[in-house]
């Protein structure tokens, strides 16, 4: 038995270095499926430590496909797993904030447990998702937004894919995904399904020199800034961590209902997003998109506050800029035509 796994089995905790090596063993295929399943099950049962998480993140970043990190980008990504079947809020918000001037490197995947993953809905919107790293950089430079399809950058995850599917419950990989952006984005909005895990992820990311990151969790269980209740926020700005609660009504946004933002398929999600960007819908769908887009504009340094960012996002939708941005993102480059 792998000695690091043995330590877990015997109730021990791993140092950052030990966790790093255990993750490398998983990613390299050195562990058997039974050993991977045992490791993930033990961690899920007792909970991961921040030190272990930092070691895991470093290993996953080291195993990811290399990509130049010169661009000043913002990512919005979530752990998923909230089970609330909402439309792809962070994807809609990404389009809005890219229309407002922020450079977005959207990291995502197809759906695993939700009704619609970010890759699924972008395809339904007619946006190419499987671009090369070079093409993605050009998209970000020229259109302010590019999509980083996770399987293209984290191919070593195939070593644990079958085990994760068989286990059928949340594992540490749900938490690691948002922390392992291929461009190692220093500015992020990370949605988390619980306050406890948000705090854990913030503590794990802090030693890795983030510039400005918001970890957000709705009191309704949504892994976004929500419109139906208050939201819990951990703001990590360089080495300063601040915790606070946001009430959407403080932003002049009327609280809505989950039923107003729930969908049953990627196609339904895409249709709602189009209506939002075309300013053909009001209420909760528009407000939750603007709230999350505004948060990223704040993190990107395009707005002085969350309030100012939210107002800017609403104006970006109302003046037609978001609609125009969607049309730009749909336009294929010559390279995309070749690989389509």
From Swiss-Prot:
Gene Ontology MF: a single term: magnesium ion binding
GO BP terms, alphabetized: L-tryptophan biosynthetic process
Signal peptide bounds: none
UniProt cofactor note: Binds 2 magnesium ions per monomer.
Pfam families linked to this entry: Glycos_trans_3N (PF02885), Glycos_transf_3 (PF00591)
EC number in record: 2.4.2.18
Binding site for Mg(2+) 2: 223-224
Chemical reaction(s) catalysed: N-(5-phospho-beta-D-ribosyl)anthranilate + diphosphate = 5-phospho-alpha-D-ribose 1-diphosphate + anthranilate
Keyword line: Amino-acid biosynthesis, Aromatic amino acid biosynthesis, Glycosyltransferase, Magnesium, Metal-binding, Transferase, Tryptophan biosynthesis
HAMAP family per the UniProt record, alphabetical: TrpD (MF_00211)
Subunit structure comment from the entry: Homodimer.
Protein purpose: Catalyzes the transfer of the phosphoribosyl group of 5-phosphorylribose-1-pyrophosphate (PRPP) to anthranilate to yield N-(5'-phosphoribosyl)-anthranilate (PRA).
Protein name in UniProt: Anthranilate phosphoribosyltransferase
Source organism per UniProt: Bacillus pumilus
Taxonomic lineage: Bacteria, Bacillati, Bacillota, Bacilli, Bacillales
């Amino acid at each position: 038995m792998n000695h690091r796994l043995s330590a877990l089995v015997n109730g021990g905790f791993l140092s950052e270095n030990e966790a790093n090596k255990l993750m490398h063993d998983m990613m390299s295929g050195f562990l058997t499926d039974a050993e991977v399943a045992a490791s993930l099950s033990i961690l899920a049962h007792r909970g991961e430590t921040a030190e272990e998480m930092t070691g895991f993140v470093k290993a996953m970043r080291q195993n990811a496909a290399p990509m130049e990190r010169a661009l000043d980008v913002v990512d919005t990504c979530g752990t998923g797993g909230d089970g609330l079947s909402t439309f792809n809020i962070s994807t809609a918000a990404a389009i809005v904030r890219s229309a407002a001037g922020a450079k977005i490197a959207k990291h995502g995947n197809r759906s695993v447990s939700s009704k619609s993953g970010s890759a699924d809905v972008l395809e339904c919107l007619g946006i190419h998702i499987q671009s090369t790293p070079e093409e993605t950089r050009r998209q970000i430079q020229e259109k302010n937004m590019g999509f980083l399809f996770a399987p293209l950058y984290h191919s070593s995850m195939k070593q644990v894919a079958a085990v994760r599917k068989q286990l059928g419950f949340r594992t540490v990989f749900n938490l690691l995904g948002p922390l392992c952006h291929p461009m190692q984005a220093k500015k992020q909005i990370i949605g988390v399904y619980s306050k406890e895990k948000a705090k854990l992820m913030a503590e794990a990311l802090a030693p890795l020199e983030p510039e400005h990151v918001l970890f957000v969790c709705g009191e309704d269980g949504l892994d976004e800034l929500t419109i139906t209740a208050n939201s819990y926020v951990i703001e990590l700005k360089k080495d300063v961590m601040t915790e606070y609660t946001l009430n959407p009504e403080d932003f002049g946004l009327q609280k809505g209902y989950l039923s107003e933002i729930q969908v049953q398929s990627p196609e339904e999600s895409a249709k709602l997003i189009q209506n939002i960007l075309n300013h053909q819908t009001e209420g909760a769908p528009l407000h939750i998109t603007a709230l999350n887009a505004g948060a990223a504009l704040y993190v990107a340094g395009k707005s002085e506050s969350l309030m100012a960012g939210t107002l800017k996002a609403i104006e970006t939708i109302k003046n037609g800029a978001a609609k125009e941005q969607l049309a730009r993102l749909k336009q294929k480059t010559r390279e995309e035509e070749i690989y389509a």
